[in-house]
């Protein structure tokens, strides 16, 4: 996934949320980053972290060319455009999510909760399970995270921004459509299987401690964990 792909869905204003996320407020990546330090340090370098930059008026020449191809005004700042901002931030239009009038820096960019769902409920499960594992190596069923609203299948959350264009093969596409389509430029073609393996777009995956066990896991879970490096573990503040 290129930077262009991460910024491709410039006109969709809401991302999909999980089953529990509908009534659970977003809280931003700071809470996640406190414990998942390595993942956070990796994410901040990615295209998803910098997604808002492509909406700013002072974007670079390459991005301005993309704007022209998509028949948008390269001189315009789209950061406050409600039809654009949703795919560049976390939780826009949802309780606790990003607000144009009061932007929270921990909700800027396509952050943790954009993929994993709103975090307050399942974060508590992570904390309790982590304490139990640290104390007695007790393993917690991963299903408990699902019950608390954590998402483990991400493809639809990607599609809602990257495939939301007129004539898209994705059946969920609807107005307002993104103007950044494969017809405008082939670099906007989206392949989930390739993109999810691209560390320039996604954060690097690190070795899990084994706190949770059992289903569900994404189908690429074992592949990523096989060669994953140990993570630097932070502490919840």
Indicate residue ranges for each PLM-predicted region:
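N-terminal export/membrane-targeting signals
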Residues: 1-22
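Sequence context of c-type cytochrome heme-c attachment sites
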Residues: 18-107, 119-151, 183-237
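Helix-to-catalytic-loop junction in kinase catalytic cores
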Residues: 88, 116, 162
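Cysteine-rich micro-motifs
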Residues: 110-113
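Substrate-binding/catalytic groove segments of enzymes
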Residues: 121-123, 166-176
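Repeat-solenoid scaffold signature
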Residues: 139-140, 144-170
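Aromatic- and glycine-enriched pocket-lining scaffold segments that form the walls
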Residues: 160, 173-188
């Amino acid at each position: 996934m290129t930077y262009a792909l991460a910024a491709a869905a410039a006109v969709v204003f809401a991302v999909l949320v999980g089953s529990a996320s509908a009534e659970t407020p977003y809280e931003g990546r700071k809470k996640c980053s406190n414990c998942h330090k390595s993942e956070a340090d990796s994410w901040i370098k990615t295209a998803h972290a910098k997604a808002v930059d492509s909406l700013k008026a002072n974007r670079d020449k390459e991005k301005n060319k993309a704007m022209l191809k998509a028949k948008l005004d390269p001189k315009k700042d789209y950061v406050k455009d409600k039809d654009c901002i949703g795919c560049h931030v976390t939780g826009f239009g949802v309780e606790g999510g990003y607000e144009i009038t009061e932007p929270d820096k921990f909700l800027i960019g396509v952050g943790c909760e954009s993929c994993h769902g709103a975090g307050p409920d399942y974060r508590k499960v992570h904390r309790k399970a982590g304490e139990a594992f640290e104390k007695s190596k007790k393993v917690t069923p991963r299903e408990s995270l699902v019950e608390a609203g954590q998402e483990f299948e991400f493809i639809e959350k990607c599609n809602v921004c990257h495939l939301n264009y007129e004539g898209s093969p994705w059946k969920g596409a609807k107005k307002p459509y993104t103007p950044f389509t494969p017809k405008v430029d082939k670099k906007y073609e989206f392949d989930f299987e390739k993109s999810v393996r691209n560390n320039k777009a996604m954060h690097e995956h690190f070795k899990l401690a084994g706190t949770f066990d059992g289903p569900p896991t994404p189908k690429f879970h074992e592949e990523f964990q096989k060669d994953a490096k140990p993570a630097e573990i932070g502490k919840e503040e």
